[in-house]
């Protein structure tokens, strides 16, 4: 009896551990998991024009160390970036399906935040779980503090700190 309970517990624990959990920092307002995953391949491109081109280029550069290649930014692609006046300035929706990743933001800044969320979802093998994320900040001002009074920070360290703040959607 004791062995069967232990075996059942071990099986449940193994099953729970094998499922990929959706962990995003900070936690979005709404996450809906779906079936399947999007795979970033050598043919994957980011579709971005105008003001959205710069956030797309930053994302492509940031994701290169994770997947081993940079994603090109073009007029057409599987990762679609758009803005909508119907959304609040920093509000976004990120929809990942097995075929496409669609990002709709209230502004280029919101699209940048959505790309930071996507950055956290990308696995080292280039897969992204199918999910719909809807988010907007709870607070207008979000930030971090760098105490430079007790320790000298080099320019590169300060830039790295700013990159970490941006990755966590702090303004």
Regions found by a protein language model. Give the residues of each.
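Intrinsically disordered/low-complexity terminal segments and short unstructured peptides
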Residues: 7-10, 43
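Hydrophobic h-region of N-terminal signal peptides that target proteins for export
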Residues: 9-18
């Amino acid at each position: 009896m004791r062995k069967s309970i232990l075996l059942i517990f071990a099986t449940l624990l193994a099953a729970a551990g094998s499922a990929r959990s959706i962990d995003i920092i900070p936690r979005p307002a709404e996450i809906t998991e779906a079936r399947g995953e999007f795979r970033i391949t050598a043919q994957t491109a980011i579709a971005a024009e105008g003001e959205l081109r710069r956030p797309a280029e930053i994302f492509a550069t940031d994701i290169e160390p994770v997947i081993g290649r940079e994603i090109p930014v073009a007029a057409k692609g599987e990762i679609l970036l758009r803005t909508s006046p119907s959304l609040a300035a920093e509000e976004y929706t990120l929809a990942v399906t097995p075929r496409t990743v669609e990002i709709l933001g209230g502004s280029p800044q919101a699209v940048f935040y959505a790309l930071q969320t996507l950055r956290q979802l990308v696995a080292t093998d280039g897969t992204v779980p199918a999910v719909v994320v809807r988010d907007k900040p709870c607070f207008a001002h979000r930030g971090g503090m760098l105490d430079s009074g007790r320790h000298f920070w080099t320019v590169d360290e300060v830039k790295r700190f700013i990159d970490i703040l941006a990755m966590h959607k702090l303004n």
